[in-house]
């Protein structure tokens, strides 16, 4: 497999999504992060010593540590009749990741974080889900003045 990842922030967001998804399936945080980052970069023993980018680790550990808070925020922005349990794991993971970056990464403008997670959503989900994620995160950004870092 050729390495299509370039260590850009978008690529690292995508790898963070992959790691978070694997954590939901029972993987340990560091192992999931190492696999998501290195599965197409190195083989054998070298994979054990691969240094993970700070941005990737910050996203994965941050979402993992704030999962309950993020889930509560997502739940409060769902339309009547919807619950967190009704969302697919893919959409939940994307929402958590996008919301975490919007809420906690001051150096990333909200609109950038929003647009980036939509691009990841288009790759791993369908167009309807990408629009749903865009709508929910846009609603959060518009309601929370401190979130509008753009």
UniProtKB/Swiss-Prot annotation:
It comes from the Bacteria. InterPro entries: NusB-like_sf (IPR035926), NusB_fam (IPR011605), NusB_RsmB_TIM44 (IPR006027). Belongs to the NusB family. SUPFAM superfamilies: NusB-like (SSF48013). Keywords: RNA-binding, Transcription, Transcription antitermination, Transcription regulation. NCBIfam families: nusB, PRK00202.1-1. This is Transcription antitermination protein NusB. One of its GO terms (molecular function) is RNA binding. One of its GO terms (biological process) is DNA-templated transcription termination. GO terms for cellular component: cytosol. Involved in transcription antitermination. Required for transcription of ribosomal RNA (rRNA) genes. Binds specifically to the boxA antiterminator sequence of the ribosomal RNA (rrn) operons.
